[in-house]
Amino acid sequence: MEGLVFLNALATRLLFLLHSLVGVWRVTEVKKEPRYWLLALLNLLLFLETALTLKFKRGRGYKWFSPAIFLYLISIVPSLWLLELHHETQYCSIQAEGTSQNTSRKEDFNQTLTSNEQTSRADDLIETAKVFVNNLSTVCEKVWTLGLHQTFLLMLIIGRWLLPIGGGITRDQLSQLLLMFVGTAADILEFTSETLEEQNVRNSPALVYAILVIWTWSMLQFPLDLAVQNVVCPVSVTERGFPSLFFCQYSADLWNIGISVFIQDGPFLVVRLILMTYFKVINQMLVFFAAKNFLVVVLQLYRLVVLALAVRASLRSQSEGLKGEHGCRAQTSESGPSQRDWQNESKEGLAIPLRGSPVTSDDSHHTP
């Protein structure tokens, strides 16, 4: 079991490393400057975290937070920023040109394979890999950027699944977290692909930066496990009042509401409303997802009110129960002594005449 945990921890971090290096390679291909390979140095933080986790935690995760996913975000997000900001090559050429290029690449690929039949098998594999890489480098840049976005979100979900769980989360809670991540990733991908496609957005560098900042901000929810962790509240919390009981009893729900309102749906709604009102970018999908974000925010706030009312009702019922219990005890303490006194007095009243006029056998048979 320990070996499997160790293997999962190491394999997941290697996948993060490879995907990050692919992103750095795309940046160097687009910018045509080898100095962008320095972005690969960000992976040194992931190397350090891997070594420390394998040595001190035996590959197991941490409670409430995943450093591996956070460092993976640090290593891949700058590459995606540079690819999105390099919008000069974001638009593909015409279909005819692309088709002719694909045909010529297929012919070159077949010729390469034919010429390599006379060489060794190792050389054949090397040449095939070179041709494959060359074909990848000629793919439309817009397709490459979208593909990196898609694989990035998939890596976050799969990596969170494969990483060993920490001590504060169960497998049932992990499955809930992964289901939440699937819906979140779909919304984030739609947000970036829908907004950055618009020509009006591309013509405004400030708006592009704002969208990328909101996108980066929304990614910070993936390293967190707080939205599914239930905290056991001690009995003393009830005596502290409403705030303590509210934040303790519904901590997971409050984190979920906060993430939705302040990290994802709330900021997404603001950006979409700005696009529709100020930049006059209106289409069917933009209106639909803006309405969806609005409904989610309203429903989350409604849920917050429902939870607050539930806690207040619980505290009120507990206080009424305590008052009723104290009242019963007070009535019992007041009525108890009088009843005992009455019983004692009745016993004494019956005993006095018996002591004052004792009955003897002679008196019982006396005749006047």
Swiss-Prot record:
This is Transmembrane protein 26. The chain crosses the membrane at residues 4-24, 36-56, 65-85, 150-170, 177-197, 208-228, 257-277, 281-301. Glycans are attached at residue 110. Residues 324-368 are annotated as: Disordered. Keywords: Glycoprotein, Membrane, Transmembrane, Transmembrane helix. It is a multi-pass membrane protein. It comes from Homo sapiens. It is found in: Membrane. The gene is TMEM26. Residues 330-341 have a biased composition (Polar residues). InterPro entries: Transmembrane_26. GO terms for cellular component: membrane. It holds the Pfam family Tmem26.
